[in-house]
Amino acid sequence: MSTSSSASALGRRAGPLDGLIGEIDRALRVLSGAATAARPYPAQAPEAPDALSERERRHAAGLMRVNHVGEVCAQALYRGQAAACREPAARELLRQAAAEEVDHLAWCNERLRELGSRPSLLNPFWYTGSFALGVLASYAGVPRNLGFMAETERQVEAHLDGHLRTLPVQDRRSRDIVQKMKEDEAQHRASAERAGGVPLPAPVRGAMRAMSKVMTSTAYWL
């Protein structure tokens, strides 16, 4: 091979196949539990022995499994939106949000382990569906794309707030994680709005809430 051919091969731009391979690799890391957090684990309160009854432990595990599924969906959704987004600044914002959600994913996974539980068995389904939804959302244009991100974060905030009301008071470790996640989601929503995200039509917001309800109801048990 000539020197010029070698340089051309080494300097080629990443193509669609490279992007696809990268997304598959990321999906496998998310679904296998291999993702690791870049920030410290928020659950710093000591785990008091016998602080939770068996019923409370199962309930806390169910809620944290729902939260874990939410982060799986967020990863896929934002990666799907970014994959088809042609505006560089919006694409970078979506990728940054997805990167920060990796922390939430790892935190929820660790808390499930501490509670003697496991992630949802349906995570491959949630990831695939959310990625496809993200790709579709991106074709609505940048303002709607970012509006979808903002509305997603708004609904997740409300959902986490509900968990803070129902988690056992003595389960400080789960509560610390959920509180930190809620703060991060508020920042993501504000970032999307500042970047030009517009409110979604009421029917779309309602459909998102209905889909979320199906997901949370199923993930609590499975």
Swiss-Prot record:
InterPro entries: COQ7_proteobact, Ferritin-like, Ferritin-like_SF, Ubq_synth_Coq7. This is 3-demethoxyubiquinol 3-hydroxylase. The lineage of its organism: Bacteria, Pseudomonadati, Pseudomonadota, Betaproteobacteria, Burkholderiales. It is found in: Cell membrane. It catalyses: a 5-methoxy-2-methyl-3-(all-trans-polyprenyl)benzene-1,4-diol + AH2 + O2 = a 3-demethylubiquinol + A + H2O. Fe cation 1 binds at E71, E101, H104, E185. It comes from the Bacteria. It is a peripheral membrane protein. Belongs to the COQ7 family. The gene is coq7. Its main location: membrane. Catalyzes the hydroxylation of 2-nonaprenyl-3-methyl-6-methoxy-1,4-benzoquinol during ubiquinone biosynthesis.
